[in-house]
Amino acid sequence: MKLIIAAPSPYARKVRVSLQEKKIDHEVIIDVPWNKNTLTKDKNPLGKVPILITKDKQHIFDSKVIIRYLDQIVPNPKLYPSDHENELSTLTIEAIADGICDAVVLIRLENVRVNNLISKQWIERQEEKIFNGLKYLSKDLDSKNYFVDDDFNLSLIHI
């Protein structure tokens, strides 16, 4: 398998950790999606990373889809809990973590704009998402060691 990533991508990081946890052999290809001659646009119509290329040359993109695929082809260790309630909790944490990452990326992109075009309101809105997301995630960590269940699962990788 080959994994196309942009080195700073938090979404690629989740997939890389998942591949390591499952001990799946893979080759990492670092690409810059913003470059004119990027591989990414040829492999994903949205031009986004990460992209997993399977042994049969199938292109799987979006970190959530890739990790679901990995959990199906190598069942152990299980990244998504088997029971419905814990799976739903893990998916909720995944959504919060992705929202936090999205907000961080949007702040970074906003800060590289020309000074007079930077929107302080936009940045404040993204910072509020980050704060609220972290507050949500930390609300009951004082009483337990894991976000979901009493075992390692995808919720820890997301954070």
Language-model segments: residues:
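GST-like domain detector, emphasizing the conserved glutathione-binding G-site
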Residues: 1-124
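Generic low-polarity alpha-helical segments
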Residues: 67, 157-158
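GST-like fold's C-terminal all-alpha helical module
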Residues: 97-157
